[in-house]
Amino acid sequence: MAIKLIALVITLCVASWDVAQGRSLRFSTTPLNRYSFPPHFDFGVASSAYQYEGAVEEGGRSLSIWDNFTHAFPERTNMDNGDVAVDFYHRYKEDIKLIKEMNMDSFRFSLSWSRILPSGKLSDGVNKEGVQFYKNLIDELIENGIKPFVTIYHWDIPQALDDEYGSFLSPRIIDDFRNYARFCFQEFGDKVSMWTTFNEPYVYSVSGYDAGNKAMGRCSKWVNSLCIAGDSGTEPYLVSHHLLLAHAAAVEEFRKCDKISQDSKIGIVLSPYWFEPYDSASNADKEAVERALAFNIGWHLSPLVFGDYPETIKISAGNRLPSFTKEQSMMVKNSFDFIGVNYYTARFVAHDLNVDISRPRFMTDQHLQYKLTNRTGDTISLESDGTKILWSYPEGLRKILNYIKNKYNNPTIYITENGFDDYENGTVTREEILEDTKRIEYHQKHLQELQKAITEDGCDVKGYFTWSLLDNFEWEHGYAVRFGLYYVDYKNGLQRHAKHSAMWFKHFLERSGKPMPMDLFKSVKRWWSTLQMI
């Protein structure tokens, strides 16, 4: 033991001297920390109900579309489901302690509609046990000095509403969502000041109704043979149209709710990629970038800022795109206090001349192809996750923020998700996953670009949330993909183990004004690995 203590002292002294002399600083001689960002900038971790809670048949909860999807089509979610998930329903108190230990300010979580209103309709009655669970969760967060940041809907609509009228395919969803949101504001609004209505309407509409790889799992049969019904050319547009109207209806309720304080805010969470032209010398590919941004961001943000869809989408989709009435346009326009941005990665895009217009679908309406490499064969980044889907492109975060600032009147933004995953294919040990240097570098580089966007470019960004606190159920990837700052041992009672990234964030967010520089952090990490072999 004495040898270990001596080793620690020597290592820390050497590391501190190296850092003081500016040696081997691979990131920066003046590393970022909490104080590199504006006062009251919000740092937090994010989650969602279906991915975390489990307890799907406990406490009066009814089944959601994801319960049905994972059990009806297990092969489409890696044979996994959220029945237990990471058991947050029973373990939220211990998980809140993990958030506090990392010096995080906020916790973003979603409410399970089917846990609060089992039938989906307020008129059919409230599940008091479900309401009490969220009240207990909110109280526990506040008692630990953590701000609750609530999402009303994160993809898990009660199955009952889909059975009755097709959920977001029907305009009937607007009033049911309005009533659900109003109830949430009344019940939780006195203690929750930050709200979002919907998480990632683009992903919900496209993955659920164009590609069919997420619940609802609908698409044209020729797009995906696993889809049993759907129309990829019309349903994504219809779903998002009703979703935007439901969002606006909820915001109306928010702004007249007597339980909501004057400093409370509400928004919606979008999920933009950044795009670069496949051929930087091609005007057609540069125009494809603009179309990609219009479909990826403008589809939902343009109605919120300007009251209507982008002209590009109107032209491409024609009469398959629903239109707003004058009253609806006025209701949707300016129905936000801030915009949530979930940014992960970027793609190259090329103009596509070979679209089959006899088989319309949302993705081909864009007349472009997504590419992982450019014309010369270069990837957009040298760093990717194990699936080769998520490529780290920090510059894209700064670019997307400036694009939104310049095109959409510089709205207030929160980075509501940003994260990097490990792919567990059975060949990687727990120790290797815990030593998540790639994740640390991913977050540091994105935070550097975010800080530039704020201080140099004038982007109005107020917060940054990592995805995610814990490894969890990652939709069609099941539990094979791990985004957590904490490792969840699915084979041993769901034990939580801090990854190195959790320790890095703890020091990044220290309020002492003396954060751990990256090289000192790496020296300590090397020391710890050495001690394991003594």
UniProtKB/Swiss-Prot annotation:
GO biological process, one term: response to other organism
Reactions catalysed, as given in the entry: Hydrolysis of terminal, non-reducing beta-D-glucosyl residues with release of beta-D-glucose
Glycosylation sites: N68, N374, N425
Domain of life of the native organism: Eukaryota
GO molecular function list: beta-glucosidase activity
Active site: E200, E417
Signal peptide (UniProt feature, chain positions): 1-22
Keyword annotations from UniProtKB, A to Z: Disulfide bond, Glycoprotein, Glycosidase, Hydrolase, Signal
Enzyme class: hydrolase
Residues the record lists as binding a beta-D-glucoside: Q51, H154, N199, E200, Y344, E417, W467, E474, W475, F483
InterPro entries referenced in this protein's UniProt entry, alphabetically: Glyco_hydro_1, Glyco_hydro_1_N_CS, Glycoside_hydrolase_SF
Any one Pfam family match given in the protein's UniProt record, by short name: Glyco_hydro_1
EC number(s) stated in the UniProt entry for this protein: 3.2.1.21
Disulfide feature: C219-C227
PANTHER family for this protein: BETA-GLUCOSIDASE 31-RELATED, GLYCOSYL HYDROLASE
Family recorded in the similarity comment: Belongs to the glycosyl hydrolase 1 family.
Protein name: Beta-glucosidase 31
